[in-house]
């Protein structure tokens, strides 16, 4: 059971709720803060105060005063009018993360909602009702309005949801789960959609998969190093200490550990003086990506515990309009994640080229083919890798430098953070397939060199991977192999092995 406080949620707890379906509860003290914030809203209404989104219109219509008899209708109207996102729906895992993050943000006690709103969010999480949320339509300020409106409508029994593996009207899902629809009161519709929980949810899952991929990439690269008689002097601790980047030091240390005892690696001057950069500069490049990912994690964990509503309602009755809904911090972090993971794929593709190119592969069969000429072997796998990394370069274009004014120029600068997060997730999927191709090629190459000459650690990894993909003995449909290996690399159980070995 994970207890949400509004202040302490971690990426690892997101992982447990999303993937392991761990149950969630609200901290009692945090709920008391929620009650105080709600009482402040109700007192302000009774005093006749004007508060944005409570008794006014929205966006450019903020100066339109709404009378008391229409205040609850205002909130459901807001959700209905804003629920105009388009495109394919987010995966259920992403929606689970949205529900979790929205509940945690409301528990900070600055949104003026009733505890019943948070209880509804947690009921959805714990019973497995996942609203249908289209992916496209957010500008990332005022938060993720359009997609979050779809999420919030389901709490009131409108829209659609996935429940027990079936897509159905949200009202039907609520009925089957024994949950009553939520009747929204003043401020609550706005509080449910004014925030960055879509970009942060997508970003958190992209980060979790990117972290896994970073560890995977080092193991795969270690096999390639052996297959190409790589020079291990480049990983000497003194080189990396002389520069000082901790992540670079760590990558070099892991490579030394994985390759310890190998009879395939060489020393400088034995076969050649220096390796190409895609081998020699592995710690520098992979380390830089790892350093970027750590910044991304830090940013996400701050945002996961942030109040991103507007206005914020304080316990003393103060209502302050600000801009915490602006997704720029997450947008920039997602753009950085895109670059970091795209680079892991870029350098992997260059190592693939060295494995299949007979002019670069130190005597390996051309394209790793059993019968070069009659059979093409891994030739087109390198094409696919090149295609994927080229697509990543397009996706890696920063979304955060783009902005289109909206709401009659009231919202004249936006973050495009959800676009950045969605593209980051796409890049991770593409990069995993590139690394799957490198692994398939590296497995074939080390076989040609002699697996008995491999390091004990890499040989263990070799045997694990060979359970997923067999040796290339004749041409076959390699897309099946690529997809199978990519799926294996994405498995969390496999990640635990690789990560734990990496951190040994």
UniProtKB/Swiss-Prot annotation:
Cross-link for 5-imidazolinone (Ala-Gly), residue positions: 141-143
Record carries keyword Transcription regulation: no
UniProt PTM comment: Contains an active site 4-methylidene-imidazol-5-one (MIO), which is formed autocatalytically by cyclization and dehydration of residues Ala-Ser-Gly.
Catalytic activity: L-histidine = trans-urocanate + NH4(+)
Keyword Phosphoprotein among UniProt keywords: no
CDD domains, per database record: PAL-HAL
Major localisation: cytoplasm
Keywords: Cytoplasm, Histidine metabolism, Lyase
2,3-didehydroalanine (Ser) PTM sites in chain numbering: 142
GO biological process, one term: L-histidine catabolic process to glutamate and formate
Entry EC no(s): 4.3.1.3
Coiled-coil intervals: none
Superkingdom assignment: Bacteria
Single GO term (MF): histidine ammonia-lyase activity
Cellular localization per UniProt: Cytoplasm
GO cellular component assignments: cytoplasm
Pathways involved: Amino-acid degradation; L-histidine degradation into L-glutamate; N-formimidoyl-L-glutamate from L-histidine: step 1/3
Matching Pfam families: Lyase_aromatic
PROSITE patterns given in the database record: PAL_HISTIDASE
Signal peptide span: none
Family, as annotated: Belongs to the PAL/histidase family.
PANTHER family named in the record: HISTIDINE AMMONIA-LYASE
Name of the protein: Histidine ammonia-lyase
Organism classification: Bacteria, Bacillati, Bacillota, Bacilli, Bacillales
Gene name for this UniProt entry: hutH
